[in-house]
Amino acid sequence: MANLFKNILDSLKLTDDEDLDDYDDYVSELEEKERRKTERQEQRQAVKQEKRTFPSQRPAFSEEAPTSSSSKLSAASGSSDFADLRKERSQRMEKTNVSKVVPIRNPQKGLEVCIMKPTSFEDSQDICDMLLSGRAAVINLEGFDVDLAQRVMDFISGAVYSLNGKLHQISSYIFIISPDSVDISGDYLDLIRQNGFEVPTLNKDF
């Protein structure tokens, strides 16, 4: 009976040991599952951390953005500089074109025509001095002594001939003389004939 009870206890003990072993196995499996779960979570956390830190590990992209913006700014500034240069060039061209505009006829300064009415023979020298200075002179001999007027015209005619000047008659007693550099045109009697120079002869009946 005692042995039977002992056997029963042993069987119960054995049964308890098996249950304990099963429990231990169950706990071990749970721990293994927890460990694997923890490892997977850690791996996921590591992956997430890598994903979070990945943009910060790309300085090239973050630096390229300001580079592109700076390139845009430089392009904009370059275009504005080009516009300024083109405007300045057009202004220079306008100034050059304005400076190249030349009037068709420039007024000749210094050209002078003197009107002389001699009262003596000495005035003929003053008339010749005007011719030497490159000025034209109008000689009015009206009311002057005819013989004296002829002497004056003889003197002036010699000066005109020696200087290769021009002598023209406007009326019977009005003449105009000019140096070779001054041309005179108009409706008058030319005292220089085609065959040479002729000294004017005044009307004795004046």
Curated annotation (Swiss-Prot):
Low complexity: compositionally biased ranges: 60-80
Compositional bias annotation for Basic and acidic residues: 31-53
One GO-annotated biological process of the protein: FtsZ-dependent cytokinesis
Keyword Cell division: yes
Pfam families noted in UniProt: SepF (PF04472)
InterPro entries: Cell_div_SepF, Cell_div_SepF/SepF-rel, SepF-like_sf
Residues annotated as transmembrane: none
Coiled coil (residue ranges): none
This protein's record includes keyword Cell division: yes
UniProt region (Disordered), positions on chain: 31-81
Localization per record: Cytoplasm
Keyword line: Cell cycle, Cell division, Cytoplasm, Septation
Coarse class of the protein's main subcellular location: cytoplasm
Top-rank lineage group of the source organism: Bacteria
Described function: Cell division protein that is part of the divisome complex and is recruited early to the Z-ring. Probably stimulates Z-ring formation, perhaps through the cross-linking of FtsZ protofilaments. Its function overlaps with FtsA.
Subunit annotation: Homodimer. Interacts with FtsZ.
Membership in a protein family: Belongs to the SepF family.
Name of the protein this chain belongs to: Cell division protein SepF
Organism: Lachnoclostridium phytofermentans (strain ATCC 700394 / DSM 18823 / ISDg) (Clostridium phytofermentans)
